UniProtKB/Swiss-Prot annotation:
Belongs to the bacterial ribosomal protein bS6 family. GO terms for biological process: translation. This is Small ribosomal subunit protein bS6. Binds together with bS18 to 16S ribosomal RNA. It holds the Pfam family Ribosomal_S6. Keywords: Ribonucleoprotein, Ribosomal protein, RNA-binding, rRNA-binding. Residues 96-148 are annotated as: Disordered. One of its GO terms (molecular function) is small ribosomal subunit rRNA binding.
Length: 148
């Protein structure tokens, strides 16, 4: 049997218990066709990048699956029919990841930000002083400036 990672996006206006019931429903479909569910991760209610079927948020759920292709195809067919499922994606993998997925692990290596992505300028406001990369200024032509 092949290994798959499956991500499911459910509508925002249903409860977390209903999302869990959906996952159990699809688990039953998969097991009836000879497949097995592995790890199930609920990522919770997260904002969508763009609106999908008039929804701005969705419940994300990741499922590790060990099943034949026919069982996965039947589960996906059932998901297309269900109105509570906004989107899903099934990807075949060589092996399942151990531990938490990348979405749930905190990134401690991310530097602390003070709400500003720009590098700090020298103190003193707008005056940057001598830039150092330019040579000295040429003298002004005083005769041309007076007549104009």
């Amino acid at each position: 049997m092949a290994l798959y990672e499956h991500v499911l996006l459910a509508r925002q206006d249903i409860s977390q218990q209903q999302v869990d019931a959906l996952v159990e429903q699809f688990k039953g479909v998969l097991e009836a066709n000879g497949g097995k569910f592995g790890k199930v991760e609920n990522w919770g209610l997260r904002p969508l990048t763009y609106r999908i079927k008039k929804n701005r948020k969705a419940y994300y759920t990741l499922v590790n699956i060990d099943a034949p292709a026919a069982a996965v195809a039947e589960m996906e067919r059932q998901m297309r029919i269900n109105e509570d499922v906004l989107r899903f994606l099934t990807v075949r993998v060589e092996e399942h990841e151990e531990g938490q997925s990348a979405m749930l692990t905190r990134r401690d290596d991310r530097r602390e930000r003070d709400g500003d992505d720009r590098p700090r300028r020298r103190e003193g406001g707008f005056d940057r002083g001598d830039r150092g990369d330019r040579g000295p200024r040429r003298p002004r032509d005083t005769e041309a400036g007076e007549g104009a």
